[in-house]
C-alpha cells in the first residue's frame, strides 16, 4: 500500500501540509503542498547528464493552472487548457527567480519544475504555495540545491504587517509583497504598494524573511523523515587556474582597456575580438574546451569590473556610484496617438504610447481566485534591434510579460478611479535601445505619456534600478546600473515611486549575506535618484494636460431610470442601433441606468445624448407639452409628444365653440400645445387641448425632436 511522508505545520493563520512519496514516483522528486484548501502538486525532474556543449544552467519552470481546481470547465472551443496565461507566466518567473541562485554555477544539467494547481480556495493564492512546493521538491530531489527556501506574502493593514493575507484582506492592504529567501538571506522580492515609505518597505522585507524560517525548518524536518540520498552528478570544474593565469598574463590589459570604453556597442565589439583571439590561441593548443575558456574570460571581466568599483574608481561609463545617466525627454512625438513620450537614459530608450478606450476595450480576466475586468493594460516590447541583434519576432516572451507587469505595478497607485476617468487605458512601451533598466525607463515614459494624454494621474512616477558589488565586508551600491553591471554584479533591485514613497519594487539577489544595512542603503539611494529623475521629468511636464487628445474618444455620461433602458434599446436593439448609426457614436448602457455616449465628435455626442433624454423623458400629469398630430378620428385627436409617446385628446377636451369641426380645423403634422390629464395603468395618455401658437410651438417642437 502506498504511503506518504507528511509534514504539517502552522504558518500564520494557515495550516500547511507537505506530502511526498505517494504520487509521481518516477519523477526525481514530487510533493503535494496544501495551504488550507489550496493544493499545488510540484514535480522536479533532472537529466542525469548535461547536454554536450551546454554553456548555461537550463532550468525550466512551468506553473500551470487547472480549472477543475475551482470546479469549472475551461473556456474556448476545445474546452481544455491551452497556452500559458499571463498569471501562469508570472508565477513561473517567481518560482524561477526564487530557486535559481541556489544552484552551483558549474551545474549544467537540464532541470524542469512543474507546479500544477489542483485545488483552490479563492482566499488563498496558489503562488506562495507553489514556491514552497518547489523548495520542498528540490530539497528532496538529491540535486545540488544549496538549501531550502521559504516564501511569504506580506500585507500592511492598519499599520500592521500581515503574514499571508487573504484575497479579501488584500483589498484593504497598502502592500502586496512576496518575499523568498533562505535562513540566511533574502533572495527575491516582488511587491506593489500604495505609496509607502522606504522604512515600511524594509520592515516588510525583514518581517517576511523572518517568517520564511518557519517553512525552511519544516522542509528540513520532512527531508530527515524522507531520507533520500543525494544523487551523483558530475559538476564540471571550470576553474583551470593554470590556463587562467596564462590568459590573464597575455590578455588582462586588453580586457581591462576595453572596459574603459563607455559606449556599449564599441565595448562589446572590442571584447568580442579579444574573446575570438583567446579562443583561437587556446582551444586547439591546450586541451581545453570553449565553455572553460569563456568561463575564465567571464571571471577576468568580473574581477576587472568589480575591483574597479570596490576600490572607488569610476564605473564602466565613467560615472560615480550614485550618478544617474544623462536624461533626454520628449513628449507628443507621435501626433495621432492619444499620448506619447520618448524617454532616454544613457543608452536605454523607451518609446511609450497611451491609448484611451471604452469599457468594451477592457480585458476580462478569468482567474482562479476570482474573475475581474482590467481597465489598465501595460504592454512591454523588447525587439531584437534594441540591442543590435537579429532575432525572431514572435508572441511576447516571459521576460516581456514580466517587465510589463512590473511597470504596471509601479503605475497602479497613481491611476485615476473609474468614476473620475471612465476610460480603459493601454500603455505600450517599445524598447528602442537597451543597456540596462529598460523596465524602469518604461515606468518613466509611461508617466510622461499618461500626462501627455491628459490622464489625471495623481503624481509623476519614476523608476530606478540599483546594483551591488560585494567583496567580503566591503560593498558598493550602484545607482542606475548598466547591463554589464547587472550581469557581473550581485543584485538587481528595481524601485518605482513618487516623491512621497514607493509604489513597487522587484529585487533579485545572486549572493547570500545581504544585510539590512545594504537594503537600507539601496532604498535610500534609490529615493535620491528617483527624486532627481522626477525633477527632470517635471521640467518637461509637471501635471496632466487639461484636455485629452482630439483623436481620443470622448465619454459622456447621463443617468436614466433603469425601467427606461428597454426604451433606449428598442425591440431587437432597433432604437439603439438607429441612434449609433445616425449620430456615429458608441452607446453603452449599464444595469443601474448609467448611459455612456462615446464619440470623437462633440456634436454627434450631444445629439445622441439629447435623443436619449427625449426617449427616456418621463411624462408628468398636469404638465403642458408640445405635440404633433398623428391621427384624427371621430372621437378625438391622437398627438405625439416629444418622447414619441402618443396620447389622445378626446373631442370633449377640445373647445367646441372654437373648433366645432376637428377635421376642418386640425390636420396631421400640425403642432399643438397639450396638457397631460391622465396616465392609466396601461401607460395610455389622455390629453387636453391648450392652444395652437404655431411659431412658438413649432420652434419648440423642432428643437426638442
UniProtKB/Swiss-Prot annotation:
UniProtKB keywords: Cytoplasm, Magnesium, Metal-binding, Nucleotidyltransferase, RNA-binding, Transferase
Domain KH, first and last residues per copy: 553-612
Domain S1 motif span(s) in chain numbering: 622-690
Broadest EC class assigned to this enzyme: transferase
Intracellular or extracellular location(s): Cytoplasm
Main location: cytoplasm
Cofactor(s) in the UniProt record: Mg(2+)
An example molecular function term from Gene Ontology annotations: RNA binding
Cited PROSITE patterns: KH_TYPE_1, S1
Top-level taxon of origin: Bacteria
GO annotation, biological process: mRNA catabolic process; RNA processing
Binding site for Mg(2+): 486, 492
GO cellular component: cytosol
Catalysis performed (reactions): RNA(n+1) + phosphate = RNA(n) + a ribonucleoside 5'-diphosphate
Enzyme Commission code: 2.7.7.8
Purpose: Involved in mRNA degradation. Catalyzes the phosphorolysis of single-stranded polyribonucleotides processively in the 3'- to 5'-direction.
Sequence similarity: Belongs to the polyribonucleotide nucleotidyltransferase family.
Record note on quaternary structure: Component of the RNA degradosome, which is a multiprotein complex involved in RNA processing and mRNA degradation.
Protein name: Polyribonucleotide nucleotidyltransferase
Lineage: Bacteria, Pseudomonadati, Pseudomonadota, Gammaproteobacteria, Enterobacterales
The gene coding this protein: pnp
